[in-house]
Every structure is written in structure tokens, then in C-alpha cells.
Amino acid sequence: MVLKDPRATSGLPKQKRDGVSHPAQPVGADFLILVVDDSADNLAMISLNLQQQGYQVVTAGNGEDAVRIAVQTEPNLILMDINLPSLDGLGATRRIREHEALRDVPVVAITAFGTEGFQRAAYDAGVAGYLTKPIDLDRMNQLIARLLSPGSSGNLYKPIGRKP
């Protein structure tokens, strides 16, 4: 299988600065997203989708690693599977929220459980959005764009390298 390098610029629109054409900056270039799922296939699919949009991506396969990586990298957004080994996604979200620098980072719950009661439990744990499996990539992309937009409620807009 051949994967296209999302940093390749041939398909990106050009911006002109000083009369010279330069590749336009990808939509998500300033943002780091942590993707957490215990399925390697889901991690690969979601990560590739995000990288093709220009987002920087880090991954974790369980809740404990998710907390550790979130603390180390301070991502702009977290996509969190709920049914995880070692520490479930709701527990990981609660632990992430204990860290001052991560309190306003949007967490999007991803799960096969779509019941209203389970959604309420996810929001009570501190998630900012909710997606059910199988994942609709268009819906996921729209939710991410909304949560990362400046002034989004529940979100601290902080592109990589810039702290509020």
C-alpha cells in the first residue's frame, strides 16, 4: 500500500508573497491532535485523514498512554475512544482535565455506544463532542474544524508554539 505524504505540496493551492508563488499552508498545520484508540486500523484511518488535511498527529493505544502523551505534548484537540484497555476513555479524560494546561483542550469521544445516557456520561466527564462508530470522517472533520476555530466555546485556541 502506498500512502501519499500529506506534506507534499503539489495538490495545495498557491499563495503569492512578494510576487512569488508558494504552497499554501495546509488547513491544520498549526494544530496537534492526539488520537486515542486501541484499534490499529482506526488509528491509521483517522491519523491519515487528519495528516492529509495538514494536522500534526500523535497517537496512543490505551488510556494510560493517552494521559501521559497529552501531558507531554499538550495537543490542541484529543479524539478519544471510550472503550480502552488499562484506563477507559472517560477515566482518561477526567485525568487529563486534572492538568491545568489541558483543562480547555477539547476532547471528542469516539465510541460504538450511542445511547443518550452514555453520551451524558461522556459530557459529564468533560468531552466537548461525541462521535459514534463507524466514524463518519466528514462529520468528524467538521466537528474538529468547529472546535479548533478561534472563539469556539470550550476551546482554548492555541496553535502549536503559542501559549495563550
Language model features with spans:
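Active-site beta3 strand of CheY-like receiver
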Residues: 73-79, 84
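Short hydrophobic/Thr-rich beta-strand motif most characteristic of the beta2 strand and flanking loop
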Residues: 54-61, 69, 131
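Non-catalytic signal-transmission and effector/linker regions of two-component phosphorelay proteins
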Residues: 1-34, 138-164
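Charged docking surfaces used in two-component/phosphorelay signaling
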Residues: 44-52
